[in-house]
Amino acid sequence: MKACGVAATLLALTAPPLFAQEPSVEKAGGYLSAFGGAVWTGGNSTGNAIFEGGVRIAPHMMIFGNIGHFADLQPDLQPSLDAAATALSSAGLGVTGGGTLPAWYGLAGVRAELPASKRAWPYVLGGLGAARLNPTQEFMFTSGTMPDGSMPDVGSDVTAALTSDGSLAAPQSSTALMLTFGGGVELPVVKRWVADVGYRYSRIAADSSLSADPLNTNAMTFGFGYRF
């Protein structure tokens, strides 16, 4: 019995230090994070990368800024591709259109932290900025006659030929207003380092040369951050 009592006493004395060594999310003056993940738009999915940093301005409030990249927001490009194919079809030329729409963006905003415990730090955020849209297009010949009277092989890329003779307008890069809302949770890994899992909704204003409607995206983000 005496041995049991000694063991219990030792356990009680050593337990606090052991628990104190468990990683926890420390309150910090700022953070730097890198994220990757998938973003869904118009029924399609693509990749998303974000580099972000923030500084504290109040006990549970930070301002943040980020730079990100969408790999391909193709659904926003499709209306202009369809319109071009329809116009060429009315002139007796059958083509199928495809393309890509990568976009870089930058945002600044406010992030509110919700300190639920030392083992997790939920947050919500909102930001406003701009997205730089860089469309590319590609049209393949299917039927009919080219403006110069030629008939390429089916499946031939006729984009350059149609652009050079003025039948097709080359897509132009443009900048559009973008806003984001979302949230996530930071989980401690080691001292000052955290894993970050979150969700972000973004809305990119309509570019009349690409689509008449704004583009909405839904992204899941996964990353790591350093709190300083």
Where on the chain are the PLM-derived regions?
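Cleavable N-terminal export/targeting peptides
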Residues: M1-E26
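Short glycine/proline- and aromatic-enriched beta-strand/turn motifs that initiate or cap beta-hairpins
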Residues: F19-I57, I63, G225-F228
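Gram-negative (and chloroplast) outer-membrane scaffold detector with strong preference
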Residues: Q21-E22, G54-D148, V189, T217, ...
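Membrane-embedded beta-strand positions in outer-membrane beta-barrel channels/transporters
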Residues: Y31, I50, L107-G109, T180-G182, ...
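Transmembrane beta-strands of outer-membrane beta-barrel proteins
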Residues: Y31-G37, N66-G68, L125-G129, G198-R200
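Extracytoplasmic loops and strand-loop junctions of Gram-negative outer membrane beta-barrel proteins
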Residues: S33-G37, S89-V95, L162-A169, A205-D207
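Solvent-exposed loop/turn segments connecting transmembrane beta-strands
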Residues: A38-G47, K118, S208-P214
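Short sequence motifs at beta-strands and strand-loop junctions characteristic
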Residues: G43-T46, G98-Y105, A169-M178, P214-N216
